C-alpha cells in the first residue's frame, strides 16, 4: 500500500516501512527510508527504529546501522526464534539469589504473553514450559526440552537470559566476543533494551568502546531506540558521544531520527555536537525540522541558546 503527498516546496520526504510508503512534507530533495514511528519517546519494545537513508543528488547515502538493522527487521530475530519452540512459555528465573541482578523483558522473542521494558519481573523465554494434566486419569506432567545451550552468547544477551549468559561467559570468556558483523553481546543487549544485561556486562569487563565493522557502537544502537537508562550507563563509562560511523550518523542523529527527546537532551548535556552533519549535509536541527519533531527541535534550540549565552559571558 503506497500513499503520497505533494510537498509545498516541490520535493518529497519519503518514509518507507517494509512494502509501505508514506510521504511527508519536509526539506527539499531529501529521501528518508526508515521504520515510521513518529510518536516514539522511549523506544518500542517490538521494533527497531533504525535503517534510514538520507539521499540527495550527487551525495553519499546514509544507512543507519544498516547491516545490523536489516538482519533484525527482515528476519525478526530469526536467529533467536528458529531455536525456540513455539510452545515455550515465559516463566520466572530466580537468579536474584545467585547474582542479585534483575533481568528485563526480551523484545526479540515472540511468546504468548506481551511484556514491555518497564516490566520488572524475572523471566526466561526459553525456560522449560510445564503442562499440568490430571494425574488421577493416568496423565503425566510433560515438559519442553531446554534449548539454552543452542543459543549464542549474543542471542542470550539480546533475550536477557542472565543465568545462562553469566554461565556462558564464566565458562568460555566470551564477554567481548564479536559476531560476523563485529557486534558484541553488549551491543546486542543495548539494541534490545536489556538494561540489566548491559549493567551486568559492563560490571564484568565488557568494553563499551568496541565498534562494529561499520563503526556502529552500543551507544548509537541504544540511542536509536531511545533506551535512556542504557544511554546513561554508557555515557558514564566515558564512551565517545560524537562517534561517527561509516553509515553517516552519530548517537545524536540517531536519537533525533527516533524522536527520543530525553536521549537528545542527555546527549547534548554530555557534549554531543549538534552541528555534525550526515553524509547528505544535514545536522540534527535540520533532521528534526524535516521530520516535524517539534519537541526535539525545541531541546536543540534551547541547547544552542545556552551555548551562545556562555560565549557572550
From Swiss-Prot:
Keyword Membrane: yes
Localisation per UniProt entry: Cytoplasm, Cytoskeleton; Membrane
Topology with respect to the bilayer: Peripheral membrane protein
Alphabetical UniProt keywords: ANK repeat, Cytoplasm, Cytoskeleton, Membrane, Repeat
InterPro entries found in the cross-reference section: Ankyrin_rpt, Ankyrin_rpt-contain_sf
Effect of residue 31 to R: No effect on interaction with CCDC8
GO biological process: regulation of gene expression; regulation of protein-containing complex assembly
Pfam families: Ank, Ank_2
This protein's record includes keyword Lyase: no
One GO MF term: low-density lipoprotein particle receptor binding
Ranges of the ANK repeats in the UniProt entry: 148-180, 181-213, 214-246, 247-279, 280-313
Subunit structure: Interacts (via ANK repeats) with CCDC8 (via PxLPxI/L motif); mediates the interaction with the 3M complex which is composed of CCDC8, CUL7 and OBSL1. Interacts (via ANK repeats) with HDAC4 (via PxLPxI/L motif). Interacts (via ANK repeats) with HDAC5 (via PxLPxI/L motif). Interacts (via ANK repeats) with LRP2/megalin (via PxLPxI/L motif). Interacts (via ANK repeats) with RFX7 (via PxLPxI/L motif). Interacts with AHRR. Interacts with NEK6.
PANTHER family attached to this UniProt entry: ANKYRIN REPEAT FAMILY A, ANKYRIN REPEAT FAMILY A PROTEIN 2
Description of its domains: The ankyrin repeats, mainly ANK 2, ANK 3 and ANK 4, mediate interaction with a wide array of PxLPxI/L motif-containing proteins including HDAC4 and LRP2. The PxLPxI/L motif of interactors can contain a Ser or a Thr residue in position 2, which phosphorylation prevents the interaction with ANKRA2.
Summary of the function given for this chain in its UniProt record: May regulate the interaction between the 3M complex and the histone deacetylases HDAC4 and HDAC5. May also regulate LRP2/megalin.
Entry protein name: Ankyrin repeat family A protein 2
Amino acid at each position: 500500500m503506497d500513499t503520497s503527498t505533494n510537498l509545498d516546496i516541490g520535493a518529497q520526504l519519503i518514509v518507507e516501512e517494509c512494502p509501505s510508503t508514506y510521504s511527508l512534507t519536509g526539506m527539499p530533495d531529501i529521501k528518508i527510508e526508515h521504520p515510521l514511528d513518529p510518536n516514539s519517546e522511549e523506544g518500542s519494545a517490538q521494533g527497531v527504529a533504525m535503517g534510514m537513508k538520507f539521499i540527495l543528488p550527487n551525495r553519499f547515502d546514509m544507512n543507519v546501522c544498516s547491516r545490523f538493522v536489516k538482519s533484525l527487521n527482515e528476519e525478526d530475530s530469526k536467529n533467536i526464534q528458529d531455536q525456540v519452540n513455539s510452545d515455550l512459555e515465559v516463566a520466572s528465573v530466580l537468579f536474584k539469589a545467585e547474582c542479585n541482578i534483575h533481568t528485563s523483558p526480551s523484545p526479540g522473542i515472540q511468546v504468548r504473553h506481551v511484556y514491555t521494558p518497564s516490566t520488572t519481573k524475572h523471566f526466561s523465554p526459553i525456560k522449560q514450559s510445564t503442562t499440568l494434566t490430571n494425574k488421577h486419569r493416568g496423565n503425566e506432567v510433560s515438559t519442553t526440552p531446554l534449548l539454552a545451550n543452542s543459543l549464542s552468547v549474543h542471542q542470550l544477551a539480546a533475550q536477557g537470559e542472565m543465568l545462562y549468559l553469566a554461565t556462558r561467559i564464566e565458562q568460555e570468556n566470551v564477554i567481548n566476543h564479536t559476531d560476523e558483523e563485529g557486534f558484541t553481546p553488549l551491543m546486542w543487549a543495548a539494541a534490545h533494551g536489556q538494561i540489566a544485561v548491559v549493567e551486568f556486562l559492563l560490571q564484568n569487563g565488557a568494553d563499551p568502546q568496541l565498534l562494529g565493522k561499520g563503526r556502529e557502537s552500543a551507544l548509537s544502537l541504544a540511542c536509536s531506540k531511545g533506551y535512556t537508562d542504557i544511554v546513561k550507563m554508557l555515557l558514564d563509562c566515558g564512551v565517545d558521544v560524537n562517534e561517527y560511523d561509516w553509515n553517516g550518523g552519530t548517537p545524536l542523529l540517531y536519537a533525533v531520527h527516533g524522536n527520543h527527546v530525553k536521549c537528545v537532551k542527555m546527549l547534548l548535556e554530555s557534549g554531543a555536537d549538534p552541528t555534525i552533519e550526515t553524509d547528505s549535509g544535514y545536522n540534527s536541527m535540520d533532521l528534526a525540522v524535516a521530520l516535524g519533531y517539534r519537541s526535539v527541535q525545541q531541546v536543540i534550540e534551547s541547547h544552542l541558546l545556552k551555548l551562545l549565552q556562555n560565549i557572550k559571558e
